[in-house]
């Protein structure tokens, strides 16, 4: 049996996950005495597009800030170095929101050429337009949102849990590769790499054979 029930974003007011992801696999595992690990390892992304509409939050990538977009408070003032790590920027935004009694801050693209916005960030541009904000002319409201769950059902390097013949893959699992704060674009490790390792183990592939093939593919 393989558990692949995703993360826990549906438990949060703002999340880039689908609302249906509510940690069901964790609940099943806990009820059967399967070990869970690092349930407090939750990554919050600093900039999701603020919206009063229910459902999944739209993520505005760090690359926008890398191109020159800056965070502003309600007075139009910068309050943080936008290129600091996600958790640091998130904390700064939360602090500013609390200070101002606001439910969002602003992301200004004023320093980003319009051509760059349209060519490099067309999806962001279109999503902001849907909410009524033309980021070539005005800032867009943003708010931190739950983005990734590094904790989960404890698994080994073949995605085996502490229960015989039970595996967990993807975001519902915790194999330790992400530590406490996942690096951007690394989520496929659990979804693809460790899922493939689990499939190999289930199929009866010998550990030594698998490791040999793995080493050859990586280093040969």
What are these model-derived regions, one by one?
Residues 204-220:
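Long, amphipathic alpha-helical stalk/connector segments used for oligomerization, subunit docking
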Residues 11-32, 163, 175-202:
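A conserved FAD-binding loop/helix module that cradles the flavin
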Residues 8-10, 43:
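Glycine-rich nucleotide phosphate-binding loop and flanking beta-alpha elements
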Residues 28, 34-140, 192, 201-207:
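An anion/pyrophosphate-binding glycine-rich loop and adjacent beta-alpha core
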Residues 120-173:
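A glycine-rich dinucleotide-binding beta-alpha-beta segment and adjacent secondary-structure elements
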Residues 1-6, 29, 167-170:
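Short hydrophobic core segments
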Residues 48-53, 148-150, 180:
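Short secondary-structure transition/capping segments
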